[in-house]
Amino acid sequence: MKFRVPRLIIRTASSTSSSSTAPSTSRVSFKDIQNNKHGLSFELDVTMREGHHDMKTFGLGFLRSVSNREHQAHTLASLHAPYAAMEFCLHEIVHKNTNTKLRKFWNKISKDVEKSNALKEDVRMLGGNELPLPAADRYVAAIHRAALNRCSENYPSSEGDLLLAHMYVRYLADLFGGSMLGKPTELALGLEANSLKFYTPNNGPHELMIKYHKLQFIEMFYDELNKCGHEMTAERRQLVVQEAILAFKLNADIFTEREGFLSGALLGGCKLVSGYLKSLMSLRY
């Protein structure tokens, strides 16, 4: 039997997820950003405009993840794997001190954006395990390949360039998705406010900027991307773009690999509506 998720639920989830994964949370804010109008940032944003990030799949995947605590735990566990791999590789780049631009970029934002520990704690809080799906294993393998990629053996300073693609896909998603998906998730699952650390800002040096002047942090993120891309050839930048396209696909696979994708999304949509109604009733009375 095939399940069809009502269009209203799909539109609601897609609009929420588009805010969470694309830099353009609104037309006005997108126009206000300047550093994504040129350089590597512009080239990476093209992947969004060309539809390589499947908003419908992400929206349905989000709904499925809030259908019950077990599914949420599985989703967060599978996300923990690529986050942990990426952040480990980035710290290794800093330790090696070969890719100077990337090292400076990561040192500047790491305490604000790292999420692997938060994901690990959330999975434990939900009573899940940390065993990722095969899709997450493929994602991790891609990250490790990206971390070791160089222009050639004679250019160790280019090692890790392709990690910029994974930072773009994951961290811009968190910056916009954290505050917008946290509350719906908690309402659908009946969790206390701010109980999921993945969706709350880190206690980093730019915490207040992220909370109250998020666009400034996004501008800084784009600026650092452009600085890293400035010394690359056009061919090298294109490899970063292709890696971002791959990362979008690998991310979608995490949501679609398990059985019951559409039926779970339908149940999650009902849980989300129910959670909102309960919240409204509690405020009213």
What are these regions (language model features)?
Residues 2-285:
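Metal- and O2-centered redox machinery and metal/ROS homeostasis
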